[in-house]
């Protein structure tokens, strides 16, 4: 989500729709991304067909700044995402072209081999110290190597860090002198 922060901030004066996200949206996290709580709209659907219909309506209306859609994550679906048919993807792509709405579709990595009408398709994978962004499909020349994006300090600081103890000997507390022992006994 942090990758989308600049784009979402640019449209934060309009509604930002989160359609069937895998987890309940966290207001503080959305605020950190630049989305005011009043601009966030969380939509859930019981069936994938209902979610696809809602996505198409949001895109065609042009009334929202952005649509973030996780297809197959309906309230009655299993833990595994259901695939979206190619004709449904084509309809969403056409609706996105007609409207003035940013459209982000989040799908599992297993679907990166499937065809899609989207002009830009990215794969995001964790990497030590950041993330690797793969270019599945883009306009222009093919890029084989993923783009490494380091994580900012603020996100790594939030996680507990394990650090080894220094190898030098720690000072041992001094033993109380006889005079101090006498004072303690008195």
What is the role of each PLM region?
Residues 1-186:
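N-terminal regions of ATP-driven nucleic-acid and macromolecular assemblies
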């Amino acid at each position: 989500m942090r990758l989308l922060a600049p784009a979402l901030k640019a449209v934060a004066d309009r509604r930002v729709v989160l359609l069937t996200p895998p987890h309940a949206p966290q207001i503080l996290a959305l605020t950190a991304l630049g989305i005011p709580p009043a601009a966030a709209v969380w939509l859930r659907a019981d069936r994938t067909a209902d979610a696809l219909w809602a996505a198409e309506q949001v895109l065609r209306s042009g009334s929202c700044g952005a649509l973030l859609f996780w297809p197959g994550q309906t309230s009655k679906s299993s833990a595994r995402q259901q695939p979206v048919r190619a004709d449904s993807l084509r309809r969403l792509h056409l609706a996105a072209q007609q409207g003035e709405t940013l459209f982000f579709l989040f799908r599992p990595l297993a679907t990166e081999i499937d065809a899609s009408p989207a002009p830009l398709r990215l794969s995001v994978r964790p990497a030590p110290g950041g993330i690797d962004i793969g270019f599945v499909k883009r306009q222009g020349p093919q890029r084989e190597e993923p783009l490494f994006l380091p994580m900012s300090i603020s996100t790594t600081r939030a996680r507990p860090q394990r650090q080894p103890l220094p190898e030098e000997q720690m000072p041992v507390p001094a033993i109380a002198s006889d005079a101090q022992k006498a004072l303690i006994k008195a």
